[in-house]
Amino acid sequence: SSTETPPSYNQLNYNENLLRFFNSKPVTAPVELDPPKVESSYVSSARGEDARSTLSPVQGFEGSGGSGSSGNFTTGSNLHMSSVTNTSNAGTGTSGTGNSGDGGGGGGANGTGSGAAPPVTLTESLLNKHNDEMEKFMLKKHRESRGRSGEKNKKSANEAMKMLEYSGPGPGHGHGIKRGGSHSWEGEANKPKQQLTLNTSGGGGGVGVGGGMPLFLDITHASSSSQNKGLAGVGVGGAGGVVGGGGSGTGLGGNGNVGSGNGNNNQPSTNQYTQSRLPCTQNINLWPPFSVGITTPTSVLSSHTAVPPSSFSPQHSLFPTFYYIPASIAASSPSSTNTNPNRPHKHAHVHNSSEKPSTSQAAAATMPLQYMTGVMYPHPSLFYTHPAAAAATAMV
């Protein structure tokens, strides 16, 4: 039978029926005995059996079956054998009553007092009832046996899953570690940016614009109000601001207050970038072009201080402004700024006419050198295109 449908009672019972039949050692009668005597012997033997024991009627029938082995009786016994199991120990093996003509005395096979038992007629309903009970019992056994095998399979499956779980965490945790490392690396890459923005609020703040504002807001505010806070180095992305040098160290870029920031801007303009950078770079100068005392960088820096909001606003979209000093602002600043009011205010020594080409050239010359170590930039093309844009804006 298929595993889906439970086997029938006869299928489950087949081997047990065969064993029970041959263990009973049936005694076959000579063929001379006629069927009526066989039937009488069956009745007498069944009368001697105890009806209350589950199998006694049937086993009495099978045990005395040897007494008359005429054709119809043996077929009947075989039919019952195929449908009835032997679970009680009514001694059918000894119940062969031999060849007695009337079959009397067959009840001795049952261990109980055969004579005292009330006569029981073996009916079809009794056999059906017995078969139903035994079928339930056999199906229960079958389910239990299948359940054991199913449990074994489940255990093996669970063990396999456990093995996978134990082996899984190796690569799984490896991925997790990689992810964690990447996140921490990204976090470290972003940390300078965050620190810069916080410091830039101080940077512009030291200049008097006040902390808490973004870098570009501080710078534009400072440059528009007195343009002395451009000293924070608008070109430097608020160099005083980037490092917070202006904000924290008022003695540096944004010396003192908003109005006085420009006073030192000439000489600290070069130092301002270096000194204001110191908090971020741990006293390591990462922007050599501005630390060198060359006239063109100073002029570039002086022009940075005078950048108005209009020239700086286009740079808001360039996220690297927090990372490096955008020299393009320096180039574009002279053309768009009111140099006359700013220059006497900032640097009287700067030449307005000659500064435009010098600033663009200086921007082009210094742009490739403005990378900060330890900072990721999107692509070099962004920076190499700035000088051209700066020159174009300067020519306007």
Curated annotation (Swiss-Prot):
InterPro entries: Period_circadian_regulator. GO terms for cellular component: nucleus; perinuclear region of cytoplasm. It is found in: Nucleus; Cytoplasm, Perinuclear region. Signal peptide: none annotated. GO terms for molecular function: transcription cis-regulatory region binding; transcription corepressor binding. Phosphorylated with a circadian rhythmicity, probably by the double-time protein (dbt). Phosphorylation could be implicated in the stability of per monomer and in the formation of heterodimer per-tim. Its main location: nucleus. Keywords: Biological rhythms, Cytoplasm, Nucleus, Phosphoprotein, Repeat. Residues 333-342 have a biased composition (Low complexity). Residues 27-120, 164-188, 253-273, 333-362 are annotated as: Disordered. One of its GO terms (biological process) is negative regulation of transcription by RNA polymerase II. Coiled coil: none annotated. Residues 93-114, 253-262 have a biased composition (Gly residues). It comes from the Eukaryota. PANTHER family: PERIOD CIRCADIAN PROTEIN. Forms a heterodimer with timeless (TIM); the complex then translocates into the nucleus. Essential for biological clock functions. Determines the period length of circadian and ultradian rhythms; an increase in PER dosage leads to shortened circadian rhythms and a decrease leads to lengthened circadian rhythms. Essential for the circadian rhythmicity of locomotor activity, eclosion behavior, and for the rhythmic component of the male courtship song that originates in the thoracic nervous system. The biological cycle depends on the rhythmic formation and nuclear localization of the TIM-PER complex. Light induces the degradation of TIM, which promotes elimination of PER. This is Period circadian protein. It comes from Drosophila pavlovskiana. The gene is per.
